[in-house]
């Protein structure tokens, strides 16, 4: 049984028993290749969420009308990626086993792999929808296969061809894009094709895991991330994409790669809080 966290994300104070979504944090950034700090993302999102309203004028919905339980952050071993992933998988599996939707707060993007490992064990026909600036399809990065630069490649190892759908991708090496052309459903630069994909996912009624790397946003809107990439989407474009894809059968999700100390203005953290609020509302009240 999970116990109440000390500092919750705003409006997420339901009991575990009544919750439809359970938040859990993975403060891990040990494989960061450029600018570290994503381990501080989950705590910053919770703390700064109190500058945000529970009500969304975009959706005319309020978190106080929803049942969300915030279980706090996992205690992860920074020196062992595999150990951290095992702990993340265990927490996600527990939440799924209890019939609830696990929503993970990163942390660097590698943390997604632990959640996907749990999800694919319950849903063998799982699909992943991936919003990101980076393809994350390297087979290894500097010899390490468990790296934030390899997370979608490791997910492909679990799911196989045609079940990973990538959007906003605008960075990666040549081999990653060649791999994507053969093995994933890649949509470069923006959300073109997302509506058509969502229509198909709904018709097929397949389980979907949604992973959002916040560096899909343009650095002008979201500079506080480890590997910023110019040419990203706007907040409103991301909000529209969230409202579209959550019409599908979302069984798990994550929001990752906020590094709050890299943006002293606090704008990036405030944006991450708003993305999380809109995602929660879109999933729970569709």
Q: Which role fits each region the language model picked out?
A:
Residues 1-286:
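Conserved alpha-helical scaffold segments that buttress catalytic/binding sites
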């Amino acid at each position: 049984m999970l116990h109440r966290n000390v500092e919750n994300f705003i409006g997420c104070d339901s009991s575990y028993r009544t919750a439809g979504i359970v938040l859990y944090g993975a403060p891990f950034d040990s494989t960061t290749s450029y600018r570290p700090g994503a381990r501080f993302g989950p705590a910053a999102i919770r703390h700064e969420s109190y500058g945000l309203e529970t009500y969304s004028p975009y959706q005319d919905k309020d978190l106080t009308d929803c049942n969300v339980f915030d279980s706090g952050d996992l205690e992860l071993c920074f020196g062992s990626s595999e150990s951290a992933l095992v702990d993340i998988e265990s927490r996600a599996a527990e939440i799924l086993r209890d019939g609830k939707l696990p929503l993970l707060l990163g942390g660097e993007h590698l943390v997604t792999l632990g959640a996907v490992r749990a999800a694919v064990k319950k849903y063998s026909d799982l699909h992943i929808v991936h919003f990101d600036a980076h393809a994350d399809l390297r087979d290894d990065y500097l010899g390490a296969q468990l790296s934030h630069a390899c997370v979608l490649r490791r997910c492909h190892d679990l799911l196989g061809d045609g079940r990973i759908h990538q959007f906003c991708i605008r960075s990666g090496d040549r081999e990653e894009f060649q791999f994507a052309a053969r093995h994933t459903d890649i949509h470069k630069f923006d959300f073109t094709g997302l509506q058509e994909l969502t229509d198909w996912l709904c018709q097929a009624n397949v389980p979907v895991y949604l992973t959002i790397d916040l560096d899909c946003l343009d650095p002008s809107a979201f500079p506080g991330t480890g590997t910023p990439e110019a040419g990203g989407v706007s907040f409103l474009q991301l909000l529209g994409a969230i409202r579209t894809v959550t019409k599908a059968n979302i069984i798990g999700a994550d929001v990752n790669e906020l590094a709050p100390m890299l943006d002293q203005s606090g704008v990036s953290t405030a944006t991450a809080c708003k993305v999380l609020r809109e995602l929660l509302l879109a999933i729970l009240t569709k």
